[in-house]
């Protein structure tokens, strides 16, 4: 069977195939509608290819040899391109027009009313009972959510919690930040888009970067954990990096003392500018000294790492610092690193649940947001929003655990209260820096003022004597001894 071009009484062979199922398609993308065509290739031996879909304007430039290794042309490529384009165009008026949604960006999409999640190599959709029959084309971007098939859902969750518990306070905050940005679109459509950044800081050699990158990378983990991008890149370079990412957390490393004051100043400037972009949804105009608004803010979160704090006033309000006080146990970290697919496997299960419960999650977010708007934590507005984002992401995770029998309501309640108390301490301590404009070096922080703020808000409890402090039921954080706070 051969493709034939008919011109008057003359017929010419074009190749060793014919085209079938030719049709016109409106391909709907995030930026608009692309008029396109689709067809299948049927070879002389009877085999038929998968659908080929491409923009109508690219039809005359198509490299036909790239479509299939067995395809042969009997004409020179430019001539064949023209003849095949004419043949396809002539068939379009007699074929029904179809609609196809093209999914390219990683993360959550709402298509024809149905939430779907692009993992890179697959689409996670609702169960067959609730999903619609929308035609969706997945455009591969070289990413994949690698899964350990030997881990069931409860095992994956248990192993994930081992990673988080390597550094309980830091781990829980980073984990909730990652959950938040995986569910970014649900937040954006229901209440408000996430716009908060974390800053993990502590001394050198504490495995800050190793831990944070291992915990936050969800794609291509079978190929190894990638080294994070560094803060010594230019502001335009770092800006382009975060605008290429979506529904994930980007780690930017490493703010530390340098011999060169110029280098330190440049890194600090980059960190603060990226924090502004995440919080405000603006990006800098290249080298013009001002910012220009984007139609959309970045769709990823950022986790900075460093050895000292920076930022005062409104800059401090855009960051939530978490201090790593002791090095992460190297042996336990190595044990977790030996199972790199735990994180991506856990999120495979979690995202399936998230997509299935998408509308329920949005309803919960609306209810919680209404309560938050009537609550005053006594901190800067941005810090209160950060508290909302991280606290509710953790609550949704606990809901997932309860629905799947991974924890009891009683344990979930204890976990929630503990995490909320942790967030209270973090945002209140940072609010002191916001209000007082404390210098960024941690050696200059007035921790007495921080403790006063925590005590005033009921998050720091002081015992009046050693007996109370040492009692088995003690819930005190410090004690007054010889007129000193210990």
What are these regions (language model features)?
Residues 296-301, 313-408:
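Phosphate-sensing "switch" segment of ASCE/P-loop ATPases
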Residues 1-169, 215, 240-241, 245-247, ...:
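Conserved glycine-centered beta->alpha loop in an early N-terminal alpha/beta scaffold
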Residues 47-54, 61, 119, 126-128, ...:
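Ser/Thr/Asn(+Pro)-rich, low-complexity disordered segments
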Residues 201, 210-264:
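AAA+/P-loop NTPase substrate/partner-engagement loops
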Residues 267-287:
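Conserved catalytic/switch belt of AAA+ P-loop NTPases
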């Amino acid at each position: 069977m051969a493709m034939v071009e008919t011109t008057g009484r003359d017929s010419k062979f074009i190749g060793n195939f014919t085209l079938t199922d030719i049709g016109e398609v409106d391909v709907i993308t995030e930026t608009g509608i692309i008029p396109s065509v689709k067809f299948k290739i049927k070879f002389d031996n009877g085999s038929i290819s998968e659908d080929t879909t491409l923009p109508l304007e690219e039809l005359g430039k198509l490299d036909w040899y790239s479509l299939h290794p067995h395809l042969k042309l009997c004409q020179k490529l430019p001539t064949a391109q023209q003849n095949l384009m004419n043949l396809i165009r002539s068939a379009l008026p007699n074929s029904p027009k179809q609609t196809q949604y093209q999914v390219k960006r990683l993360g959550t999409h709402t298509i024809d009313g149905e939430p779907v999640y692009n993992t890179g190599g697959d689409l996670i959709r609702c169960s067959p009972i609730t999903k619609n029959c929308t035609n969706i084309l997945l455009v591969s971007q070289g990413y994949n959510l690698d899964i350990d098939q030997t881990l069931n859902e409860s095992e994956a969750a248990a192993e994930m919690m081992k990673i988080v518990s390597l550094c309980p306070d830091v781990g829980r905050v980073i984990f909730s930040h990652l959950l938040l940005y995986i569910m970014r679109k649900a937040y954006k459509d229901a209440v408000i888009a996430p716009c908060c950044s974390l800053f993990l800081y502590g001394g050198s050699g504490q495995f800050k970067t190793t831990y944070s990158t291992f915990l936050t990378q969800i794609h291509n983990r079978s190929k190894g954990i990638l080294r994070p991008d560094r803060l010594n890149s230019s502001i335009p370079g770092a800006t382009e990096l975060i605008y290429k990412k979506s529904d994930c957390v980007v780690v930017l490393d490493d703010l530390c003392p340098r011999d060169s004051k110029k280098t330190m100043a440049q890194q600090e400037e980059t960190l603060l500018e990226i924090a502004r972009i995440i919080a405000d949804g603006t990006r800098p105009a290249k080298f013009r000294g001002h910012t220009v608004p984007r139609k959309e803010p970045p769709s990823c979160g950022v986790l900075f790492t460093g050895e000292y704090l920076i930022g005062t006033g409104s800059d401090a309000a855009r960051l939530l610092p978490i201090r790593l006080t002791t090095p992460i146990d190297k042996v336990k970290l190595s044990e977790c690193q030996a199972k790199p697919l735990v994180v991506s496997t856990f999120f495979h299960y979690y995202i399936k649940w998230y997509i299935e419960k998408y509308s329920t999650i949005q309803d919960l977010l609306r209810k919680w947001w209404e309560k938050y708007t009537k609550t005053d934590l006594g901190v800067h507005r941005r810090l209160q929003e950060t508290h909302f984002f991280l606290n509710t992401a953790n609550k949704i995770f606990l809901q997932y655990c309860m629905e799947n029998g991974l924890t009891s309501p009683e344990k979930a309640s204890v976990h929630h209260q503990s995490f909320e108390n942790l967030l209270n301490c973090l945002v209140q301590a940072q609010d002191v820096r916001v209000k007082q404009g404390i210098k960024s070096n941690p050696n200059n922080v007035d921790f007495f003022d921080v403790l006063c703020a925590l005590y005033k808000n009921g998050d720091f409890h002081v015992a009046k004597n050693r007996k109370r402090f040492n009692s088995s039921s003690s819930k005190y954080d410090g004690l007054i001894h010889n007129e000193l706070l210990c």
